[in-house]
């Protein structure tokens, strides 16, 4: 879910 970009829609809160 968390990667080089911000949290994307459809992902659980992880940032």
UniProtKB/Swiss-Prot annotation:
Residue(s) carrying Cysteine amide: 15
Domain of life: Eukaryota
Cell location: Secreted
SS bonds (residue pairs): 1-15, 2-11, 7-14
PTM annotation (4-hydroxyproline): residues: 4, 13
Tissues expressed in: Expressed by the venom duct.
One CC-aspect GO term: extracellular region
First and last residue of the signal peptide: none
GO MF annotations in UniProt: toxin activity
Keyword Secreted: yes
Chief place of localization: secreted
Keywords: Amidation, Disulfide bond, Hydroxylation, Secreted, Toxin
DNA-binding keyword on record: no
Free-text comment on this protein's domains from its UniProt entry: The cysteine framework is III (CC-C-C-CC).
The family this protein is said to belong to: Belongs to the conotoxin M superfamily.
Protein name: Conotoxin SI.6
Organism: Conus textile
């Amino acid at each position: 879910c968390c990667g080089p970009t911000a949290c994307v829609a459809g992902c659980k809160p992880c940032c």
